[in-house]
Regions:
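Conserved acyl-donor/pantetheine-binding loop and adjacent beta-alpha core of acyl/acetyltransferases
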Residues: 60-98, 104, 154-159
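Conserved acetyl-CoA-binding loop-helix of GNAT-fold acetyltransferases
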Residues: 99, 105-118
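Conserved beta-hairpin
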Residues: 50-64
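A short beta-loop-alpha structural element at the N-terminal edge
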Residues: 8-21
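Short loop/turn motifs at secondary-structure junctions and domain boundaries
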Residues: 43-47
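Conserved catalytic-core motifs of GNAT/GCN5-like acyltransferases
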Residues: 68-71, 129-131, 141, 146-162
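Conserved GNAT acetyl-CoA-binding A-motif
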Residues: 113, 119-133
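Helix-loop element at the rim of GNAT/NAT acetyltransferase active sites that forms part
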Residues: 13, 24-37
Length: 175
């Protein structure tokens, strides 16, 4: 059944009506580091261009969301509350990439990441930045992210690692 779902998955920008589903995904896939419903609502309202969902048969089953900034230091936890979000910032910062457990393992997170990377390029961002746990470093390396080192963030009581994906545009340089 899972394999058949992937054919029916549509990746699209978030809509206000997706809030409850996105909060369910966030709270199911994350523990003490999960964003609150209010934070997700704020991300949807402030930066829908940086928020994609995966939908199968009318159900939102996965998401990726972000904010934009001119800062290189993304360890300030207030940023996840969109405190320093700048729509036209040079960097886009991934906050969450999550797929409901029943739909994991069939390429949905890959489709979300591929579309997110394409959308970030279209927005002319210089880099995608993120923090991840140790177990996800190899996942992001598959997308050509570079490892920047251990983060000073201790969000949720976890050890985090910083990674980034620089973009090179047609003019031969970065944007």
């Amino acid at each position: 059944m899972k394999q058949g779902i992937i054919k029916n998955v549509k990746i699209r920008h978030v809509a206000a009506g997706d809030l409850d589903a996105c909060f369910t995904i966030e709270s199911t896939c994350y523990t003490t580091d999960a964003a609150t419903r209010e934070k997700i609502e704020k991300r949807i309202a402030i930066f829908p261009a940086g928020f994609l969902v995966a939908e199968a048969n009318g159900q939102v089953i996965g998401m990726i969301n972000s904010g934009a900034t001119n800062k290189d230091d993304i360890t300030d936890d207030a940023f996840k509350d969109m405190a320093d979000h700048i729509h036209d910032g040079k960097h886009i910062v991934i906050f969450s990439l999550a797929v409901l457990p029943a739909f994991q393992g069939v390429g949905i997170s890959r489709r979300l990441m591929d579309m997110f990377i394409e959308a970030s390029r279209d927005l002319k961002k210089e880099k995608i930045l993120l923090m991840c746990k140790s177990g996800l470093i190899s996942y992001y390396l598959k997308y050509d992210f570079l490892y920047a080192g251990k983060s000073k963030s201790t969000l949720g009581g976890f050890e985090w690692h910083e990674m980034y994906l620089p973009f090179v545009f047609d003019n031969g340089g970065q944007s």
